[in-house]
């Protein structure tokens, strides 16, 4: 991964391109993020950088957080994330990552937490068809049989059944950067991304970046 940054989802809107095309976009306030720690393969077993986003009052942070951020000299940060960047060796503690590393047309992957839907049935959770809506069937939204008979006398793992839906880590791939506003640290991404408004998402180069 060559590029990466942490941002806060602000919401969705729509913009018009020069040819008049209307494009739905998600607005993300991305960075600036400060490099707080470098992890190397020799010491940690892998190479990455830990970055901080959104400063907070140092008086509200515990001593461990204050001590961890003091080397960067940029304050104490609310959100810490690790990014595996190829240019990890070129980054030093205290360096900043900004939206200027992205350009319109770039393909990115966005990682966030999907919105929780609570306990849901198989029709909403797994797109089951459901039974006939006829009189006397008594089978409308039920999942049906979940296993076999005496052999194997159990329910197989990963069987699609009712349960908790959403509220899990999700990555949406190959989203396109429509516009970058370096003055306000905003990046406009085509389409929808995971997570709710004002929550933190991770933006990075797409692993399927072929245009």
UniProtKB/Swiss-Prot annotation:
Checking InterPro entries in the record gives: Ribosomal_uL3 (IPR000597), Ribosomal_uL3_bac/org-type (IPR019927), Ribosomal_uL3_CS (IPR019926), Transl_B-barrel_sf (IPR009000)
A GO term from the CC aspect? cytosolic large ribosomal subunit
Gene Ontology biological-process annotations: translation
Keywords assigned by UniProt? Ribonucleoprotein, Ribosomal protein, RNA-binding, rRNA-binding
What Pfam families is this protein classified in? Answer: Ribosomal_L3
Q: Which GO terms describe its molecular function?
A: rRNA binding; structural constituent of ribosome
Q: Does the keyword Cell wall biogenesis/degradation apply?
A: no
- Please state which protein family the record places this protein in: Belongs to the universal ribosomal protein uL3 family.
Q: Which HAMAP family does the entry link to?
A: Ribosomal_uL3_B (MF_01325_B)
**Annotated function:** One of the primary rRNA binding proteins, it binds directly near the 3'-end of the 23S rRNA, where it nucleates assembly of the 50S subunit.
> What subunit structure does UniProt give?
Part of the 50S ribosomal subunit. Forms a cluster with proteins L14 and L19.
Write down what this protein is called. Large ribosomal subunit protein uL3
Q: Taxonomic classification, please?
A: Bacteria, Pseudomonadati, Thermodesulfobacteriota, Desulfuromonadia, Geobacterales
